[in-house]
Each structure stands twice: as C-alpha cells, then as structure tokens.
C-alpha cells in the first residue's frame, strides 16, 4: 500500500466500522486490527491479532502517519477485566507506536465516563488509559476524545432504548434532574477526520457531544420522541433499589457463569450520575472545521 496510512483498532465495532467507511470514502488508506482473518483490498490491509499481540501491533503501526485507537472493553466483572484491555492493551499500542522512527500522531477514543473515574471499573480504566497516553505526549503527538453516549444505526447500547421509547415508554435510572449529552456516530467520525486532516497535530483531552446547550433530560428526550413518532411517551423512573439489586445479582451470576455483564453496580452509578453534559468549545477551537450537525430530533427516526 502506498500513500499516507492510518492505523485503526476496533474497526469491526460500531464506531470503528463507521470510521473505516468514512476513511475509505475520503481517500485514506487504512491498516486495521482484526481478531479473525479478513481479505485485504487496494485500500485496506487487515492485521490479524489483538491488543495483547505485540508483533501484530508493530505490524499495524509500521509506517503509518496516525493511529486511531477505537478498541475497548465495555463489559466486565472486575476491575482487572477492564484494565487488561483498556489500559494494558492501550499501553501495548502506545509502546509499538513510539518505537517507530517517526512516531505517528495518536488518538485515543475514550469516554466521558473517564471524567468521573470513581463511578465504575470501566470509568477507572478509561481514565488510566487516558493518563497513559498523555504521559507519552512528549514523544508523539497525543489526543484524547471523550465522547458522551454515542448512537446511530447499528449501535447496541442506545438503539434498544430508542426501540422501547417508540412503544411509548422511556425507562430511566436516577432522577429527573439528571442531564446528559448525546452524540451521533457520524459527528464523532467527522471529528476524527478533522483531527487527521490538521497540519499541526492537536494535543489534549476533549469532550464531545452534539452541542445542545445544557444537554438533554428525560423530559426533553420524551418530548422529542413524541414529536418524531406522533405518540405519547411516558418517562418511567425505575426504583433505584431494584436496579441495584438486579445489577448485583447480574455481577455475581457473571462471575459464577463466566460471562461479561453490562449491567453492574458501577454501570448503575454511571446511569444515576447527575451531569454528563459536555463543553465542546475547546474542541471546536482546536478543530475549527468541526461542528456537530446531527441532533436527536434529526436522527431519532433512523436511530433504531
């Protein structure tokens, strides 16, 4: 493959797959990490391996101009589960990158959860991964994106909620005063493309949502859903004690039966947190060509 290359992890996941399509459409050549064999083409080279495979990671980043690290673990039954993938895996990728004669610019797709690392094992691991990346910014240009909840066609986290909402029920955990940001996957990918295209590498940690002032709350989401789907939508706040009980049972069942749970006590604390609204001003200053363009009202009918 000739021409500028970008290395991508997580290219088979929700965000990574949308990014891959956009990169190819934009004329980039991509080298991507994959766990299972895939067929190369003129513009995409697949490197078989994972974040534990140091040789695969060296092959992934060899000669690339940029690394976009989308891969990460969102389910787990212990802090160690998350640290292994999100921290140690990131460390392996950083190590492979800084060993290059000309280290590439490096972008970590983290999570807004890292802003509150005390809430969950996931949030802790994301914050640790961020710090690891930033600690190497004197060797290679490093950037961290902290997107809020990302949704869009194909996502497995928000789409089920939207499907239930279409039936007239918006289930929530926490309090009516909670506020949160949302981000369409296309706007996140657009920010990544802008980051790649800057002549001078961008440094720092940046939050991303759709830019709605003050974010959303349960009532505003319900109102938008009513407008889009032309039916009444009722907000139902699930009892906190019941949700916590289910989360604890799920965690212990996961440890007993050896599966990776999504609903854990830490996830419940994330869901109950009062403020997940972003300030995107720093990123719009760093990337003047980026502005979020898709609000929930625009995307809800296609989000499921």
Predicted regions and their residues:
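Mid/C-terminal beta-alpha module of Rossmann-like enzyme folds, strongest
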Residues: 198-262, 294-304
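NAD(P)H-binding glycine-rich loop region in Rossmannoid oxidoreductase-like domains
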Residues: 38, 44, 48-88, 96, ...
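Substrate-positioning beta->alpha
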Residues: 156-160, 174-197, 203-207, 217
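Conserved Rossmann-fold NAD(P)-dependent oxidoreductase catalytic core, especially the SDR/UDP-sugar
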Residues: 69, 88-127, 143
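Amphipathic terminal alpha-helices
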Residues: 5, 274-304
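Conserved catalytic-site region of short-chain dehydrogenase/reductase
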Residues: 76, 112-121, 150-155
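N-terminal Rossmann NAD(P)H-binding glycine-rich loop of SDR-like oxidoreductase domains
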Residues: 6-26
